[in-house]
Regions:
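Structured, non-membrane catalytic/scaffold regions adjacent to prosthetic-group chemistry
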Residues: 1-35
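Outer-membrane beta-barrel initiation region
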Residues: 30, 34-173
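Phosphate/adenylate-binding glycine loop and adjacent helical scaffold
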Residues: 74, 136-137, 162, 167-184, ...
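Transmembrane beta-strands of outer-membrane beta-barrel proteins
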Residues: 139-141, 176-181, 215-221, 256-262, ...
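Transmembrane beta-strands of outer-membrane beta-barrel pores
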Residues: 145-151, 162-164, 182-191, 203-205, ...
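Residues that define the transmembrane beta-barrel architecture of outer-membrane proteins
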Residues: 150-154, 193-199, 234-242, 274-282, ...
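Outer-membrane beta-barrel "beta-signal"
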Residues: 158, 320, 342-354
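Repeated loop/turn-to-beta-strand initiation elements of outer-membrane beta-barrel proteins
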Residues: 164-171, 178, 206-216, 250-258, ...
Length: 354
């Protein structure tokens, strides 16, 4: 079966969502689409609808302490006990509790629920989600302009896959990004020279909010070849940078996250002192994912074995979706290079997804 209408060269970069879209768009292959929220999605949705008193009693109830719901109305007790039972099921399937403990908690919850006179009505599930088949296309090309340390430039960028935090996340998982082979070419006015500015071989970021019920790990992984300037000597050259980090994210609202990460980084380049560096990185930032505006702002402190990477980087990125496959973007960063010449860059671009 030949799925989709992409030319041959584009099939090299096809991601799983592209294949799913191709099947969905092929006449006669798909009769309908059903949305099934996961158990975790249902639990989170139900917990967010509860009153403060209900939420306070939810965890004790899930531990089998059913007396925690005694001050609630019967309807509120029923909602807490049913959600707590789903949570206990989740913990058991995730192998966070043993079978004996699962049975003890389940028996306590179901016994308490059976004593209530409230009928078991249809549970209110999370509303139908935004279908990924309506998400933006995975490939992206952009043209833009900006300035680095007073030197104006024009930029062309191409990313085969897949999604950035500042892209429109309609139909996709908020707070998650995967960038693969993101290529940036620049022409600087001062030197009238076109250079490879950066090649992001792989960039993965997951900002998954933690709460009283779930505590997922937020993380970042990156590998990139970048043209950089040594602030101590002013020399430019290419550096292969890699980093991994992990931490926690909290949600101040459905579309506003705060996060903190700690990680390690390293780089190799012929023009660097001793050709390499290693660093420990601490990062704090926020991500706002409104429908018509995506904003990422963070500060990263690097403790490095080389003066080259000893810095505090302040970075901000913004994206404004214009249509399904069009957006405007702006990027800014400022490097405080520990007493050496600082770096500052700003750029704006138009992006097209295809």
């Amino acid at each position: 079966m030949r799925c989709g209408r992409k030319p041959g060269w584009r099939r090299v970069f096809r991601c799983p969502l592209d294949t799913a879209k191709a099947v969905y768009r092929s006449p006669g292959l798909v009769k309908g689409v059903s949305y099934r929220p996961s158990r975790r999605t249902r639990i989170v949705f139900q917990a967010r609808r509860m009153t403060a008193a209900q939420r306070q009693s939810l965890l004790p109830a899930a531990e089998g302490k059913t007396a925690a719901v005694s001050d609630l109305t019967e309807k509120e007790r029923a909602e807490v006990l049913e959600t707590a039972y789903q949570y206990v099921q989740y913990l058991y399937v995730a192998e966070d509790i043993e079978l004996a403990e699962y049975r003890r908690r389940s028996f306590a919850l179901l016994s308490a629920r059976s004593r209530l006179q409230v009928p078991a009505g249809a549970k209110e599930e999370k509303p139908v989600g935004r279908t990924p088949f309506a998400a933006h296309e995975s490939m992206r090309v952009s043209v833009g302009a900006g300035s680095r340390n007073g030197n104006a430039f024009q930029e062309f960028a191409f990313r085969p896959a897949y999604h950035s935090l500042e892209d429109d996340d309609f139909g996709l998982l908020p707070g998650a990004e995967i960038n693969f082979l993101n290529l940036r070419l620049r022409r600087y006015d001062r030197t009238d020279k076109t250079v490879l500015n950066r090649l992001d071989v792989l960039g993965i970021r997951s900002l998954s909010p933690a709460d009283e019920l779930f505590s997922p790990l937020s993380f970042t992984v990156s590998l990139a070849l970048a043209r950089e300037e040594d602030p101590a000597t002013g020399r430019e050259g290419y550096v292969l940078n890699g980093s991994v980090g992990a931490g926690k994210t909290v949600a101040a609202a459905d579309n506003l996250y705060f996060y903190a990460l700690a990680g390690v980084a390293g780089g190799y380049g012929g023009f660097l002192p001793r050709n390499q560096y290693a660093a420990i990185e601490l990062t704090a930032g926020l991500f706002a994912g409104f429908d018509r505006l995506k904003l990422l702002a963070e500060a990263k402190k690097s403790f490095s074995s080389s003066s080259f990477a000893e810095r505090i980087r302040y970075r901000a990125e913004a994206g404004m979706p214009l249509a399904k496959n069009w957006s405007l973007a702006a990027e800014y960063f400022f490097d405080d290079n520990a007493g050496k010449d600082n770096d500052e860059e700003f750029s704006v671009s138009v992006r097209y997804y295809f």
